[in-house]
């Protein structure tokens, strides 16, 4: 069985946080004999300060399933979407994007959006756009964790998110595997305890299709390349041209002007 998690974060300020979460998912999955990969969306590079970016974790039972799931720009049927800043629930406008992508757009039917926030799920839901299917909204009580590109704010947000994911998507990673991965990677029992508490305390509520922000996300219809041909393309000169009245032979192509 294949599962995927996307982590939406603020570029530069939360880059390390996003990568630590997705890497932790894969490390935990390996403890269960599964295979996985953690990667960033290449369209986000180079990241801009505060501009939304994404990191992904894909877990599968074998290499064949994993490779089949990775043959795309970004996973589009995620089990869990993590927003490590609750303002991202208003929608994601990445720097290489044109328009606003709802936070739950790439979350599968019945999947979960997990946000770190000091607000209740009901308050966070007001910012989330409606979805045609039922989904779940989960909240970990926390303020947004911001740091820098080279300096990491080790406030346990990463392990708390990992603990919550074990609760929300046990088919991907179980709590015992998350705890084992934390011990091996960070060797900190306090972080193990933080993950366990997040597993127990994460708030979850079901969301119906008629709940949430009813506004239509704005988008731009950009012209196709062939519609801008006059401004983008200089027609090439034919390699050779036939000569009228000649039987065979040719003359070199030349610019008529």
Residue spans for each PLM region:
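Active-site cofactor/cluster-binding pocket
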Residues: 1-256
């Amino acid at each position: 069985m294949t599962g995927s998690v996307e982590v939406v974060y603020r570029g530069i300020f939360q880059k390390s946080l996003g990568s630590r979460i997705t890497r932790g998912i894969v490390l935990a999955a390996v403890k269960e004999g599964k295979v996985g990969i953690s990667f960033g969306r290449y369209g986000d590079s180079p990241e801009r300060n505060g501009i939304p970016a994404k990191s992904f974790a894909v877990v599968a039972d074998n290499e064949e399933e994993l490779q089949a799931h990775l043959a795309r720009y970004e996973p589009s049927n995620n089990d869990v979407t993590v927003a490590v800043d609750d303002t991202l629930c208003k929608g994601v406008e990445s720097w290489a994007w044109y328009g606003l992508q709802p936070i739950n757009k790439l979350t599968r039917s019945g999947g979960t959006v997990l946000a770190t926030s000091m607000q209740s799920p009901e308050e966070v839901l007001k910012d989330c756009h409606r979805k045609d299917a039922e989904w779940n909204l989960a909240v970990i009580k926390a303020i947004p964790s911001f740091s820098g590109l080279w300096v990491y704010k080790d406030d346990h947000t990463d392990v708390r998110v990992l603990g919550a994911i074990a609760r929300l998507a046990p088919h991907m990673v179980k709590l015992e595997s998350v705890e084992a991965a934390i011990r091996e990677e960070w060797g900190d029992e306090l972080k193990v305890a933080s993950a366990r508490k997040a597993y127990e305390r994460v708030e979850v509520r079901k969301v119906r299709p008629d709940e949430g922000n009813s506004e239509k996300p704005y988008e731009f219809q950009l012209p196709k390349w062939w519609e801008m041909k006059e401004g983008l393309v200089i027609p090439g000169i034919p390699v050779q041209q036939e000569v009228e009245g000649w039987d065979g032979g040719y003359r070199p192509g030349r610019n008529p002007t």
